Amino acid sequence: MAIQVVILAAGMGTRLGKPWPKPLTPLADGRSILQQQIENVRSVFGDEARISIVVGFKLEMILEAQPDVSFVYNEAYDQTNTSKSLLKALRVSHESGVLWLNGDVVFDKSVLERISDRIKNEKSFVCVNTSAVGEEEVKYTVNANGIINALSKQVQNALGEAVGINFISNKDKAHLIEELNNCADNDYFERGIELAIEKYGVAIEPVDISDLFAVEVDFQADLDRANSNFN
C-alpha cells in the first residue's frame, strides 16, 4: 500500500513575519519549504505516495502552489493548534500508518531513507535531534526500554528535541485520534501523543537523526541555517 504523508501547513507562522504561509517561504535553491518536502517524499517513496496538506491561513496560495496533492481544511486555523490539524487529517486517512511533517521543516531526503524501514514495519516513532535542546522546542525523555514517556516543551532533563517528522502506526492510530480529540484547542499534537502513551501505553520510539540535516524554521536565524545547506 502506498505510504500516507500529511503535511501540517494551516498555521499563520507569525514569528517568521512573512506575508505568506510559512511553508511557501522560498529557500536559497529556489524551492519553497513545502516544495522541497514534497520532492523529498516523492524521491524516497515514489510518485504513488499519498500526500495530504492541512491548510488554513491563505489556503488559496498553497492550493495553487501544489495542485497535485489532496487537502484537508482546518477552518479554525486561527483558533486551534497542530493537535486539531493533525486530528482532521488522521480522521480522513486510509488504513495503514501515517507519516506527518510540520510544514516548516527543511530536511535532507536521507532522513526519510533512514525511517523508511520503520514505516514499512508499522512502528510508531518521533524523529529527534540529541545534539540540541532548545528552550522553545518540544523535548523528550524515555523509559528504561528506550520508549518515549514525555514529549513537550516543558520536559525537564530532556535527551533531545523533536524535529517535526513523525509516524503513527495503523494499530496506534485510533488511540492517537481519540487523544487528539481530547486535547485542548491550543495544544500541540505532541500533547495527544503524550496522552496516548499515558492512557494506552502506545510505544513511540525516538529515532535519532542528529547526524542528518533537518531544521525547523521558526525564526530568520533558522531560515539562514536551513539555507546554508544549499550554499
Give the ranges of each region predicted by the language model.
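Short beta-strand/turn micro-motifs composed of small residues
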Residues: 9, 28, 55, 102, ...
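A structural signal for short hydrophobic beta-strand segments in well-ordered beta-sheet cores
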Residues: 24, 140-142, 206
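N-terminal nucleotide-binding beta1-loop-alpha1 segment
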Residues: 1-19
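Conserved alpha/beta core of the MobA/IspD/sugar-nucleotide pyrophosphorylase nucleotidyltransferase superfamily
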Residues: 2-3, 161-231
